[in-house]
Amino acid sequence: MTKDRLAALKAAQSDDDDNDDVAVTVDSSGFMEEFFEQVDEIREMIDKIASNVDEVKKKHSAILSAPQTDDKMKEELEELMSEIKKNANKVRAKLKVIEQNIEQEEHTNKSSADLRIRKTQHATLSRKFVEVMNDYNACQIDYRERCKGRIKRQLAITGKTTTNEELEDMIESGNPAIFTQGIIMETQQANETLADIEARHNDIMKLETSIRDLHDMFMDMAMLVESQGEMIDRIEYNVEQAVDYIETAKMDTKKAVKYQSKARRKKIMILVCLAILIIILVGVIGGTLG
């Protein structure tokens, strides 16, 4: 039965809030205490990114549903995106430092229990970070497609029909004026429609810049998590083995209790039989003597 690796990791973790810390016996040395403070800090930053991504999704929907461009809302969206980028770079830098420290120690103390703990924590945090950033990337791409759809509908209102390929060419040109060529702006509504088209085009341009900015970091992290796949597999295997061992132990305990109960009942029955036999013998002997 195939199990999700992350689910297997979570099954082995002890944090009650988000199950991100693998349950292990930790050395109480100052070094490990400092390490786990770093882990908590990184986790909080990843959680903050995830929260901001949820807010970005809400802003996307609000902007697209608004009849006219809301500059304040777009400023708030840009602030969220800027904060996500800043925190993502911080998380990546901190994970990189942990990774480098692990690589250095592997050459001197490969069997260290502390080292194994740090490798597991690093792998868990890296995977969670990639999942959050992948969600962010997906929401940006989704917003781009929705912006394209709105541009296409607005162009249709002005009487200009375009294919998806033509629309992509217009967007990639980076020149919003291309959208308005040949369109006569005789009414206020037409002006508003064209302004909305240009606003959506600008949104797409900013999105593509954001995606490019995070692309290299995202690919670097994704490759790191993929390279950790073998270690994650080993963790999953160990977790499953531990679960199987516990279940087997439970079954053995139940069997032992059952067998012990049966043995106790047999012992009582034998004692009762012996008592009855003794009473009969005493009666027989007493009758004979009488």
UniProtKB/Swiss-Prot annotation:
Listed transmembrane segments: 268-288
Family: Belongs to the syntaxin family.
Protein name: Syntaxin
Residue stretches making up the t-SNARE coiled-coil homology domain: 194-256
Residues in compartment: Extracellular: 289-290
Residue segments, region Disordered: 1-22
Single GO molecular function: SNARE binding
Natural source organism: Aplysia californica
